[in-house]
Amino acid sequence: MSSSAIQVAKTATYLPDLVEVQRASFKWFLDLGLIEELESFSPITDYTGKLELHFIGSEYRLKRPRHDVEEAKRRDATFASQMYVTCRLVNKETGEIKEQEVFIGELPLMTERGTFIINGAERVIVNQIVRSPGVYFKDEMDKNGRRTYNASVIPNRGAWLKFETDKNSLLHVRVDKTRKINAHVLMRAMGLSDNDVLDKLRHPEFYKKSIDAANDEGISSEDQALLELYKKLRPGEPPSVSGGQQLLQTRFFDPKRYDLGRVGRYKINKKLRLTIPDTVRTLTHEDVLSTLDYLINLELDVGGASLDDIDHLGNRRVRSVGELLQNQVRVGLNRLERIIKERMTVGETDSLTPAQLVNPKPLVAAIKEFFGSSQLSQFMDQTNPLAELTHKRRISALGPGGLTRERAGFAVRDIHPSHYGRLCPIETPEGPNAGLINSLATHARVNEYGFIETPFWKVENGVVIKDGDPIYLSADREDEVRVAPGDVATESDGRIKADLIPVRYRQDFEKVPPEQVDYVALSPVQVISVAASLIPFLEHDDANRALMGSNMQRQAVPLLRPERALVGTGLETQVARDSGMVPISRVNGTVIFVDATAIVVQDEDGQEHTHYLQKYQRSNQDTCLNHRPIVRCGDQVIVGQVMADGSACEGGEIALGQNVLIAYMPWEGYNFEDALLVSERLVTDDLYTSVHIEKYEIEARQTKLGPEEITREIPNVAEESLGNLDEMGIIRVGAFVESGDILVGKVTPKGESDQPPEEKLLRAIFGEKARDVRDNSLRVPGTERGRVVDVRIYTREQGDELPPGANMVVRVYVAQRRKIQVGDKMAGRHGNKGIISRILPREDMPYLPDGTPVDICLNPLGVPSRMNVGQVFELLMGWAASNLDSRVRIVPFDEMHGAEMSQETCEAFLKEAAKQPGKAWVYNPDDPGKLVLRDGRTGQPFDQPVAVGYSHFLKLVHLVDDKIHARSTGPYSLVTQQPLGGKAQQGGQRLGEMEVWALEAYGAAYTLQELLTVKSDDMQGRNEALNAIVKGKPIPRPGTPESFKVLMRELQSLGLDIAVYTDEGKEVDLMQDVNPRRSTPSRPTYESLGVADYDED
């Protein structure tokens, strides 16, 4: 297929750098965030005030990391840099100053791709969206149906302050959800006189009631107010004025305990129209009085006061890596401060140095904990480039300081008008996290305060002005202007065509003439996320199916021979480039050397730059990372040019699947309920073959009986099983291994008790020690097979860090090619997913008039009810494109070029294709888009014409090889003694309550008895049954299930006298000791029954 791409609709602009949100935030942390934290703790003074330790934060430095990124991955190390900071110790008494550079810990560094390498694994820190600090006004209904108002002042850290009104028009205040206090008590405690307060209020008469109430309670002075405050906040402790003073001071006016943050100060100033400088991060009297004033205006419904919508994006902000890390550093420094103070007090004042005071451990621990186990530090999804990119742009409302799944209501999850151009309304998970985890829209960016902004073009007098950079607006700012959507039609000079334009204004829609429009959106794509923007004809799909389509593209497995989509949206190149999976030229220059492992570029100054390529590396999801060069020697390259294809890329574009010939028709019921019927061509031509790399690991440990040994000499193993092992007993690279083959030979010393009696006898007679080791080798597990692509040996001698107790670690990487097979899951880009139900020989598949057999038959009933008609447009456009030998790029929302544009474009392309020589049959005007197909088995035409065309289909990561599983015997749960569940635990299939009902309905008594006893938790019965099966004897009668015994014990523990009796009324002792080696069977088994007993039964 030629690579000439026809661009049908123009993209408005190139997208901005898609990983910017991660990189910019980490850069801010290194430039400002870390310094800010270090300096906020300086100086640290000891309890006597003699010594002071100053951190000179602006002079911190980072050492070059010990390992580079690749080395860190290989050694399971962390890609981190050591932090040093200059400390100054001042002795106040002698005036002596000691200055020293001190090591304060290791800081993991971000790689170029926006990820972190922690213990050899690539991780991503997900952005968190939280409620912005500031002041919020809400209304609530009380029990009597009267509306009351309240105001909450929410800091970045510290105590919440909540003012509320009640039915008697009194003002109350709560600190951190404690008991109500009269608001005027707080005012007096803060040292404000009645007149100070009344002068600041626009409606003082409303407040006078609260003053009277305070006087009635006998609180007329500052001291009384402080005592009252202390009583309410610290009930049960003896109150004192100084205690109250201290409490108030630390709760709200101490920068260490109370911090509004830059954002909180900015929001409060904006809401209450104050002009307090943003260096003042604590509460001020002015804040409190203005809040009261605003609340009273709300209560009286005057002065333009308005309530806040907490789900509005102007009131939610994004915390990215930098800020999350800064919070964690603060936790570490808090611990460090305590240690330093203790050491100052304990140590000898004269001989102390800064290095003795500063212990790096608490800071290291805090940072390690954040990267290793925080909810927001996630193992990177590396299935394909799109998955990686989307993961870095994810925005989660969960995590520390955020919401929890259980508490999040419907309003938080819902789409809000302020999401436009900021958060994608489509891409979110299905299930309990729906709406809590979102994706950043394509053009969105995060501003310095953490609010999401989106770009617009300015409109003046009905003309769109597109020179210069677009203007970014935050959600608050956007509400105040009239914004037209991105698909308004304009003349060539930028003048808006229509007489009335639909605009959004204050979260409502209205129609206005072009002169009143203030801004117009940049592009129709700016509303959606990167994954959704890769779906062609997105506007014809129902939103639920588009959601599945964008989620399933992230699960596409990189194929052996990827192929670009025939019908795309034009954003594929940038997605591939920004994902970080493809190598990009760092300089302008000429390629002077290319091979499979490296590309060398010579720049204009004659310097050589080597770009190394990855070969068959294992990704986090066991898919294969591999680079294939696409430049040749002598090619000119420019900065940012893609030089090699990564996995799931072709020609520098993302290529997640294959373009296959699809027919929408039923075939013998094999595509009932979303099943797929596919042709054998997909298997034989390796269209959907993917490479998967598994990692197997074994450690040789030090045991009590001596060290384990990695060796070729394994007891009781035939020589042919060792054919592929080297002299150390490790498999050679390139060997093909199947289930049960030895990868690494290992023997473990055996203790006395492990030895069978005949061994002991031999040793007693001959006195010589038989080689007492047992085979503990690493073998290929159950269903796996493949080729060994890499072996890595780690020992302490080489300087590798090993887990405690291990002498040697060996890792073997096995690659397998997986062809497509029955049970694999496939999907299109429009949420049309299905499982392969049958693979037909190509001669039996329906075929086209020119004899081409179809690749996949889809059920036509999958389209109407699901309303994802985009797949039909893609099908027809792909059919036209393949017959024109070209590729088509269509930007979503093309209706801006005219009504019914998609349909007209498809039809025009089909007519064009039919004009090609010998292609007249491609388009039938009586049945546009359909062809008469013939049955491959009989050669007879089908009754109805069928819609046929090329569609981009993906193979998803849910492969049947990884799911299929069977259990004969295996591990049991410790508590219930029932088999475990799941493939990883070698578990069984659960027969739950409803399955038991189904069997009861059929009266399958013996099946039921087995299910509830020997196949489950009758411990003795199952051992006897196994024994009987192995020896070929009849299976004995089942006994009592363990869970029944538990039930009996539970009922007895309630004080009920419950027991089990035989027919004769004899009590059965359920708790008798079960000893399988007893000579007399505990109950009749088939062996112990006489012939006479059989007859009676």
From Swiss-Prot:
Keyword Transferase in record: yes
Catalysed reaction, written as an equation: RNA(n) + a ribonucleoside 5'-triphosphate = RNA(n+1) + diphosphate
Lineage top rank: taxon: Bacteria
CDD domains assigned to the protein according to its UniProt record, in alphabetical order: RNA_pol_B_RPB2 (cd00653)
Biological process according to GO: DNA-templated transcription
Entry's EC annotation: 2.7.7.6
GO cellular component terms given for this protein: DNA-directed RNA polymerase complex
Enzyme class: transferase
Gene Ontology MF term list: DNA binding; DNA-directed RNA polymerase activity; ribonucleoside binding
Pfam families reported for this sequence: RNA_pol_Rpb2_1 (PF04563), RNA_pol_Rpb2_2 (PF04561), RNA_pol_Rpb2_3 (PF04565), RNA_pol_Rpb2_45 (PF10385), RNA_pol_Rpb2_6 (PF00562), RNA_pol_Rpb2_7 (PF04560)
Positions of region (Disordered): 1072-1097
Keywords (A to Z) from UniProt: DNA-directed RNA polymerase, Nucleotidyltransferase, Transcription, Transferase
PANTHER family assigned: DNA-DIRECTED RNA POLYMERASE I SUBUNIT 2
Family to which this protein belongs: Belongs to the RNA polymerase beta chain family.
Subunit structure: In cyanobacteria the RNAP catalytic core is composed of 2 alpha, 1 beta, 1 beta', 1 gamma and 1 omega subunit. When a sigma factor is associated with the core the holoenzyme is formed, which can initiate transcription.
Function: DNA-dependent RNA polymerase catalyzes the transcription of DNA into RNA using the four ribonucleoside triphosphates as substrates.
Protein name per the record: DNA-directed RNA polymerase subunit beta
